[in-house]
């Protein structure tokens, strides 16, 4: 499969990393991720150049990653710094590939492509995750589907009415107001739900209030698969800027052609010190992401080989505009790298 390699992807959450290496495959590339004694995260190819043992099974010795097989040691840049055998020679062939890493917004970003092109300024903004005006709860999930299926799912805001009916269904669905905005390296899908009864989830945000409300469900896409959702609610007629809202992290990183990593979070501007609201959002994440979206996209993945082998093309609905635009942008990025 063709992956877009010259881009920033999330490899891990900060709490996943310590001096014990984490092995994780990204874009069919095995990585060893670990935090060095100075706190800086290192990412090395998870293959020792000697006999190809996984370095993620090793340990840190004096700040260096030691291979579990023959004891070669590597610094965070991938250079072999110790060879315990023979005369201790360390030719260039003993060095291992390292990858650019940036820790930002409580996310570990990695650049799997040409290191010379790795510009930290191109990392999309997820500052709400560390903004003291917000409270963030989230986590990591593994999904057995091609990452593009989840991109389609997330950019299609209308699916919530059916897939997430237990929590997000609205009686104002027939009055939805939609807009798609295309910017420089960014696509937004905006949806307003005017004058409806609060959904089950929104009612929890409002502490059980049941008066007519306006609600919003927006999402922003940045290459290649980083999305920031905005769900909000306010009494009918209230400006969007005065709503209570949650900004949702939805970042997908391909693992293989048929699996991906899902980094998610909800950053809210209300009930910041309320552990009960933490529970509401964790329950929503477990239900919507694990029990609902995951089930749907994994079922589609199991049919993907048949669909592709038989040249079946998807029928289009009016709600597909944002997802289709994003799909085309990803195709352009793939073609650009392949050229």
From Swiss-Prot:
Its EC number is 1.14.15.-. GO terms for molecular function: 2 iron, 2 sulfur cluster binding; metal ion binding; monooxygenase activity. Changing residue 153 to A: Strong reduction of O-demethylase activity. Residues 8-110 form the Rieske domain. Keywords: 2Fe-2S, Aromatic hydrocarbons catabolism, Iron, Iron-sulfur, Metal-binding, Monooxygenase, Oxidoreductase. It catalyses: 3,6-dichloro-2-methoxybenzoate + 2 reduced [2Fe-2S]-[ferredoxin] + O2 + 2 H(+) = 3,6-dichlorosalicylate + formaldehyde + 2 oxidized [2Fe-2S]-[ferredoxin] + H2O. SUPFAM superfamilies: Bet v1-like (SSF55961), ISP domain (SSF50022). InterPro entries: Cholesterol_7-desaturase, Rieske_2Fe-2S, Rieske_2Fe-2S_sf, VanA_C_cat. [2Fe-2S] cluster binds at residues 48, 50, 67, 70. Fe cation binds at residues 159, 164, 293. GO terms for biological process: catabolic process. This is Dicamba O-demethylase, oxygenase component. It comes from Stenotrophomonas maltophilia.
């Amino acid at each position: 499969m063709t992956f877009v390699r010259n881009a920033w992807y999330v490899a891990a959450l900060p709490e996943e990393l310590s001096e014990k290496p984490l092995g994780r495959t990204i874009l069919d590339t095995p990585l060893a991720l670990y935090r060095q004694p100075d706190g800086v995260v290192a990412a090395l190819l998870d293959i020792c150049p000697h006999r190809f043992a996984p370095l993620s099974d090793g340990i840190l010795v004096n700040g260096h990653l030691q291979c579990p097989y023959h004891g070669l040691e590597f610094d965070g840049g991938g250079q072999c710094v110790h060879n315990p055998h023979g005369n201790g020679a360390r030719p260039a062939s003993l060095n291992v590939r390292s990858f650019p890493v940036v820790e930002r917004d409580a996310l570990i970003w990695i650049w799997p492509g040409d290191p010379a092109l790795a510009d930290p300024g191109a990392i999309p903004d997820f500052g709400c995750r560390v903004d003291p005006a917000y409270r963030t709860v989230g986590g990591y999930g593994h999904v057995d589907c091609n990452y593009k299926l989840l991109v389609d799912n997330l950019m299609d805001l209308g699916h919530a009415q059916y897939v997430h009916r237990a929590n997000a269904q609205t009686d104002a669905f027939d009055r939805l107001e939609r807009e798609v905005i295309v910017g420089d390296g960014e696509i937004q899908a905006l949806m307003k739900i005017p004058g409806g009864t609060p959904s089950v989830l929104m009612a929890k945000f409002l502490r059980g209030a049941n008066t007519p409300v306006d609600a919003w469900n927006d999402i922003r896409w940045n290459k290649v698969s980083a999305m920031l959702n905005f769900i909000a609610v306010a009494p009918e007629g209230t400006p969007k800027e005065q709503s209570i809202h949650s900004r949702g992290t939805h970042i997908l990183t391909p693992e293989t052609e048929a699996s991906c990593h899902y980094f998610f979070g909800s950053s809210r501007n209300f009930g910041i010190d309320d552990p009960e609201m933490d529970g509401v959002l964790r329950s929503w994440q477990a239900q919507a992401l694990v029990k609902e979206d995951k089930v749907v996209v994994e079922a589609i993945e199991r049919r993907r080989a048949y669909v592709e082998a038989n040249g079946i093309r998807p029928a289009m609905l009016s709600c597909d505009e944002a997802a289709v635009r994003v799909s085309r942008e990803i195709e352009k990025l793939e073609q650009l790298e392949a050229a």
